[in-house]
Each structure stands twice: as structure tokens, then as C-alpha cells.
Amino acid sequence: MVKQLINVIIAGTVVVIMYNFLSHQDILIGDMLQKESVKGAYLTGAGFLDVNIKLWIYRIISIVIIIAVYNFIRGIKKEESKKILFSIILIPAALIIVFIVNIAIDSIFLRGNDIDREKEYILQNIRATEEAYNINVENKEIAKGTDITSEKIKKDSELIEKLPMVTPDVVKETLENNTDNKEKKSLYKYGNPNLVKNGNAYDYLTTREIDDKDKTLTNKIYKYTHGNFGILTSSSKVNKNGYLLNVSEKFEGQELNGTKIKEPRLYYGENTNSNAIVNAKDIKEYDYPTSTLTNKENNYNGKGGIKLSLLERIALAITKGSTELIFNNNIVENTKVLLNRQIIERAKKILPNIRYDKDPYLVTKDDGGLAWVIDGYTVTSRYPYSQKVSIEADKGGKERINFIRNSVKVVIDAYNGTVDFYVTDTTDPFISTIMKTYPTLFKNYNELSENIKKQMRYPQYLFDIQAKVLTTYHNSDVDNIYRADDRWEVAEVSGSGTRSSTSMYTLLKKGDELKPAIITTYTPEKRKNIVSYLVGQTENGANKLTMYRYNEKSELSLSFIDTQIEKDEKVQKEMRELTTLGAELKTVRILLPYEDTTLYIKSIYQVFLNEDSVPVLKKVIVANKGKVGIGNTLKEAMQRMLTENAIDIDVRDLANEDELKDAIIKQNKTLKDVMKQGDFEYTGKDIQRLIKLVDQLEEVSKEKKKKTNIEKTN
């Protein structure tokens, strides 16, 4: 009995010591600077007290536990009650002493200015955060915003006509509700529209995958087996009646990115969930409609799938729990079964160790075939010192992470189903470990064709996370991170009704051409003026971030200027003229950087209130620097923005008077605290901030009096 008790105690001791050891590691991903005197949010990592006090506390506790257990066991063996009692008292006594010492040290250290003490550890947090999120930003100052003139519009006429004013949401809504497309609509499920290069223009490609909903099991497995490329819709033009312009809806003979598509069939896809049996006896696959009454048929001739020999049929019957394949009369020598056709699940079955982007996209191959690209990420929440952010979890809800790298590009052949994993970031420690586990699985990124590299885009999932991190870490000065004096917020760049987006794919003018990019904008915390915009671009498959900062007077946010436009009587008159019985107006807002200024584009669509109604573009409103123009096209609206009939709006972002008063009170309190600490460097900085806030309050008060006097005069 005594021996068993001793073994239990020893096992318990080992568990406690292991827990203490793991607690050492947790300090590196815990929260530092948790005291009320710290103005900013918690930073991830071990601070001065963690490294110099808490780590030693864990070590001392481990030693005390070992001594106590050793004495306890000896006391039991020799039946010495004093040793047993001493051992029982030792651990709680040590914990009480450690607790008192910890409080005393905390209070002593927090009396002085702790920025100098914590500087080294905050710097580690900054470096680790930039490394963990792969944030290598090129900063560019915008000294003076570009003035849009008639000469500039004339010179850039061709480029302006190619600027995207149509959003992916409108494209998808149109395709799904188009009454002229009923037959195709019942056959196909449309993917998310993606901006692609098509000749000299950029269009939206919306993939057409077979929709197996409401189809019999036989039709689902044998007949309706595959989708077909997609529909190309102009991102910048509509037809003469205002309907979106489908550049190409063909099922064969399409061209994309300078490559003629020879094999447009999609046997593997984003929305292809069912298995398929191809080349079955006396059964032809549906290919695509050639007219309202006739269809083209097809037989699969790809490398994908498993030939259904008797042995394979028995194995599949056991796996699927069904004997249907064994006794199936439709199976002949060339019959194959195509399994795991949903591309993300297909990749997961091969490599479950990484996270996959939920928005794959289609690219053309050198041989005229099609392939899907899926971005793969390594993600963790246990990277030492890197700042944690809250994101949408892979399976719903929220999760906190502090490391993400887009280290893998997965390329899946849409016809054959072959899967290739290309490593894009060999500096990623996690992918390096995975590569050692699966040495033959990965390919070097240089092996991927240049044609596919050119078609790759910056992943929106990664971009949004990096943009969120940069709300704080855009200014990586230690003092700024410590005091949180220069925080930004991510602003809206596009919106429609209640839906809005903080990032979007668009085209940016670069010299004399347009380049695809993903953008987001920033405003200072609780303000509406845009101080910067972040651009993500992919050059030959490599992701690149550029931060454009306004040096002088900043631009205004989309939501603010949209409200100002809606208040104008001339705009309201135009809107009333478009109002028709049985229809509603739908507005789509876009913020678009154009050289060193920003265009605020508001597209007005008319939507009839019947079940299958599509948006019809009626007007385009453009605003820039207090001037607003309305036209039938973007170019026409920009031209009218420069005429005498242009609408003037007030674009000053005057802060709320009560908010400013609260900010002054808060800043005054901060100043007093800093003066008590005797920190002359921060005293000077805080005085400057207080003066700035008082100046802003004075400006708001003057404006308020001015408006009151005008109202009295009227």
C-alpha cells in the first residue's frame, strides 16, 4: 500500500513539474504589460517581470516541490511525522511567500517609468510580429494629391474606360437571376467572379460547375458529370440599355490570358461534390447545350479516376458500404470512377497539415487546359512574442492566431485531378518541418510555369489579416506600440446596401497601364479621414505589400462622402427621376485610388421587384475633392465633375464636439500621470497632443457658430 502511494506521489510530481516547464513556454505567448498604467492593448510575449521574476518563480516552485516530495517519501518510509508535516506545510508556505514577493516587486517596478525597462521586450514583439505575418511593407509618401483635369481625362481616356466600376456581387446576382439563362441556370452552379486579364482588358470570370441539386442518382453519377469553364463579364462596361456585358459565354473556343483554351471541362472543382462514373456502357455524358432543344455529349478521356476492375469494385463496395458497383451492368473495360472531386477536400486528404483558402480560382495552363489554384497557409497561435489577432475560425466562430504564412500554392488540374504542392516560402519554419515529414510531396516553386505564376493573385484571406495587424504595427516605433498613440482602423472600400467590404480586388494605374491589386484603406481611430491605403500585388507569384501614406491633407472615407452626396438636393432630384413603380434603386459604392488621389464611385442600379430581376445600371456618380459629377458612364461622370454644373459638397471631417472634449480630458489626465513620473520626453509629446486637440475643438466651435449665424440670417 505504501509503495503504491509513493508511486502515485512520484507520478504526480512529474506531472506538476512538466506543467511548470510548459508554463515557461506559455510565458512567451502570454500577455505582457497588463497593468492599468499601460495605455495600449496587451502585447504578446514575455516582459521584464516575466523573464526576470516569473520564470524564476516557476523554477523555485519546481525545486520546492521536489524537496517536499523527497522529504515526504523519506518521512513515510522512516515513519517520521515531523518530515511528513514539514513537507505538507512547505509547498503552500512557498506559494504564499512567492505571491507576496510577486506583489511587492510589481508595485516597486510600476512606480517608475517602465518604458525603458520593457523596450527590449517590446522590440522583440515588433520583430516577431513582422516575421510571423510576413509583413515586409514598402512605404511611399503621397506628398500632394493629383488634381484631375480635363486634359488628364483626355490623356487617360482609354485607361479610365477600363477602370472597374462593376463589383463581383452584381455580376453573380445578374448571372443567377437572368431570365434569358434559365436552362443554363438549372444546370450550372456559378462560382465567385474573379478579376482576370482578357486581352487588353480585365473581365470577371465566373466558373460554371455542374449543379447536381434535384438530379436523380443515375443522372448525377453517369450523365451530369462536369462543368465547363465559365462566363466572362466586363468589369468596366455595360450595354446600351445598362445591362452587364457578358464578353463571352461560349462553351468552346474561349481564350484567356493569351492562351486558347483547348480543354474547358471541369471534372474537379470548388462546387463539385459528388463522385462520377465515366465511360459507362451505352451512357453518354451531357457536355453542354448547343440550342434550346439539342445538347452536345462527351466521353471522359483524362488521366483521373480509377479503372473499375473486379478487385477495385469489391474494394470500393467495402469502403462505401454498398454492393451496387459489384453487380453494376453499366461497367465495362474503360469505365472509371472519379472520386474526391471537391478540390479543397481533395487537397486535405493528401496534406491535412495546412489550412486551405476557401476561395480557389481558375487559371489557364500552357497546354490549353485549366487548373485550380488554392492558397495554402501554415497557422499557429504559439509563435513566441508575435502579436495575437482574432480572426474567423476555419470551422466557424473566432480564434486567436499569431502566425500565418502563405507558404504553399496548390495547383489542381481541372480535367485530370492531378494535385501539385509548390512551396513559395522556404523561410517558414513550419513548412520546413512538414517538408521533412513528406520529402517527395512538395515541388520547388521555380518548377511552376511562368504563365501560371503571372495569373496568381494576392490572397484576400491573408491580406485582410495582415491589414488588421498593420492597424497597430504600421508604425513600428517602440514608443508608439507601447503607448498606442497612432492606431488606425480599417475602412470600408466597397459597399452595397447593408453589405460592405474592407478590401477588394481592383486595378491600379501604374504608369501607362493598369495592374491588378487588392486594396484596403485606413482611418485614424474613431475618425473618418483616410490617412493611408494598403496595396497587395503578386509579381511572378511573390506577394508584395505597399503602404501609400498621405503626407498633406488626407482623403475622406467612403461612408462619410457617401452621406454627404446623399444630402445634396441635385443628387436627390436625379434619384427621384430614376424611381419607377415596381422597382427599387440599388447603390454600389467603390473607393478607387487613382494615381495620387482617390475616386469615390457610386453606381446606381435599377432592380425590378420580381423574382428574376437583374440590376440595370442607370447612373454613375463620381466624387473627388469636394466635386461631384453624375453621368451614364464613369468617364462621362468624371468629365461632368469638372464642369460648372458640378455639385459641390462639404468634405471637411469635423469631429464631434463632445468626443473632442472627452479626448482633451483623457489626454490631460495622461499628461498629469507622465509629469508625476518625471518623464520629460513623454511630457513634451503629450503637451503637443493636448494642443492639437484644443486646436481641433476651437475649429469645431468656430464652425458651429458660423452655421448658427447663417441659420439666424435665413
Locations of regions flagged by a protein language model:
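Soluble extracytoplasmic regions of secretory-pathway and membrane proteins
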Residues: 1-677, 681-711
